[in-house]
């Protein structure tokens, strides 16, 4: 997955007047692969935000996370798939906008990739799903539409559009 457009985020005058570099997309994908906690923001029907930390993995250009369909965030995603994700750091920033939806039962090949990625990242935290973990549901996929990233707010804020 590669962005179709790379530009600058829009800021009010005086915020970031002379950025001198860009964040490479490879840096963003590295952060997506290595980050342990992703902050998922969905919305209630009345527009109030609902934010929750999620464990997630970045596989084949998409972000996958899992959980019960009965959780509040899962119900919100079904009601309104437009969500944001923010990675752990407030300094090395990656903010994503896109859509999330139930992924359904993954193919055997994809399930194997997902299980391996989860095991590599979260076994030390007590979570190591097997490939059949999502046969009955509980897997969600986030598709990136826009990303904003920076490693230094004043010099390299970068916007990626897909």
Which residues does each predicted region cover?
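Short, basic/aromatic recognition patches
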Residues: 12-39
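Short beta-strand segments
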Residues: 35-69, 75-77, 83-87, 95-97
């Amino acid at each position: 997955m590669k962005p179709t457009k790379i530009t600058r985020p829009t800021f009010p005058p005086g915020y970031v007047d002379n950025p001198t570099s860009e964040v490479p997309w490879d840096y963003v994908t590295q952060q997506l692969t290595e980050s342990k906690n992703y902050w998922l923001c969905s919305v209630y029907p009345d527009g109030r935000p609902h934010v929750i930390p999620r464990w997630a993995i970045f596989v084949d250009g998409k972000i996958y996370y899992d959980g019960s369909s009965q959780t509040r965030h899962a119900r919100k995603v079904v009601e309104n798939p437009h969500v944001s994700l923010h990675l752990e750091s407030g300094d090395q920033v990656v903010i994503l906008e896109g859509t999330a939806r139930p992924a359904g039962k993954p193919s055997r090949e994809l399930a194997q990739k997902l299980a391996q990625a989860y095991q590599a990242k979260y076994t030390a935290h007590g979570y190591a799903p097997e490939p059949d973990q999502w046969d009955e549901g509980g897997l969600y996929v986030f598709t990136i539409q826009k990303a904003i990233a920076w490693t230094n707010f004043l010099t390299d804020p970068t916007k990626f559009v897909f």
